[in-house]
Amino acid sequence: MTPNEQYSGGLPPLVPSAPAIDPWNWPPDSGWSPQRNLIGYHVKATDGNVGKIDMATHAQDASYLVVDARRWIFGSTLVVPAGLVSVIDHSEQNVYLICTKELVKSAPPLKPVDGKFTNRPDRDKLARYYRAALSR
């Protein structure tokens, strides 16, 4: 079953309760700064490693991480909205998420347009997915 089939067939996997998120903006207390390069940092969900950051954006209402998850999901690159970041540990080069690996893995895919993940309908679908999952 594909991630889209899983999502369209019901709610995503349950995760611990989390505050409402603004998916496409960095949380103000996350430790994010446009002066810091996050490429190569490890991304960690609440239950383990997701992958390494290949790209991080900081555009208003369009911030996200592109994560190389090939060691975990064969051949996969994932887009993780910046609003899922709880904290960034610059000394250890780790980015911690507010959700589980399964939630990230089951998310609807976001396809690049001209090398950027800015397709509005896909972004809206991804935002709805995470809001629904994290508000339960």
Identify what each model region corresponds to.
Residues 1-136:
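Peripheral interaction segments used for macromolecular assembly
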